Swiss-Prot record:
Protein source organism: Schizosaccharomyces pombe (strain 972 / ATCC 24843) (Fission yeast)
Cellular compartments per GO CC: catalytic step 2 spliceosome; cytosol; Lsm1-7-Pat1 complex; Lsm2-8 complex; nucleus; spliceosomal tri-snRNP complex; telomerase holoenzyme complex; U2 snRNP
Assembly with partners or alone: Component of the heptameric LSM1-LSM7 complex that forms a seven-membered ring structure with a donut shape. The LSm subunits are arranged in the order lsm1, lsm2, lsm3, lsm6, lsm5, lsm7 and lsm4. Component of the heptameric LSM2-LSM8 complex that forms a seven-membered ring structure with a donut shape. The LSm subunits are arranged in the order lsm8, lsm2, lsm3, lsm6, lsm5, lsm7 and lsm4.
UniProt GO molecular function: poly(U) RNA binding; U2 snRNA binding
Name under which the protein is recorded: LSM complex subunit lsm7
Gene from which the chain derives: lsm7
Start and end residues of each stretch annotated as Disordered: 1-23
Highest classification ranks of the organism: Eukaryota, Fungi, Dikarya, Ascomycota, Taphrinomycotina
């Protein structure tokens, strides 16, 4: 029998190769300890204080409140459900927005009835 030798190449390296660290798409560090709003796939919305995040956009939020929607038409009801400390998975996020320094405006593309 012949002995097999490892050849250098991808997957056969005995030493770990150093890769550049992946950066996050957004720099959320400036919103650390500030209240933000997050919208998820499916339309759910929460607000909370950003306590931590990683490069995959997973978030840790504290003092979280969910804005409840009407199940029939999907419009916000004005009711709020307190959730406390929440870990949000980055793959479910659609929108992240700071609460301070922003205001809601009417959609300019919707025709007035």
């Amino acid at each position: 029998m012949s002995s097999l030798q490892k050849r250098p190449g991808p997957g056969n390296s005995s030493q770990p190769t150093e890769r550049p660290r992946k950066e996050s798409i957004l720099d959320l560090s400036r919103y650390q300890d500030q209240r933000i709003q997050a919208t998820f796939t499916g339309g759910r919305q929460i607000t909370g204080i950003l306590k931590g995040f990683d490069q995959l956009m997973n978030l840790v939020l504290d003092d979280v409140e969910e804005q409840l929607r009407n199940p029939e038409d999907g419009k916000l009801t004005g009711a709020i459900r307190k959730l406390g400390l929440v870990v949000v998975r980055g793959t479910t996020l659609v929108l992240i927005a700071p609460m301070d320094g922003s205001e809601e405006i009417p959609n300019p593309f919707v025709q007035a009835e």
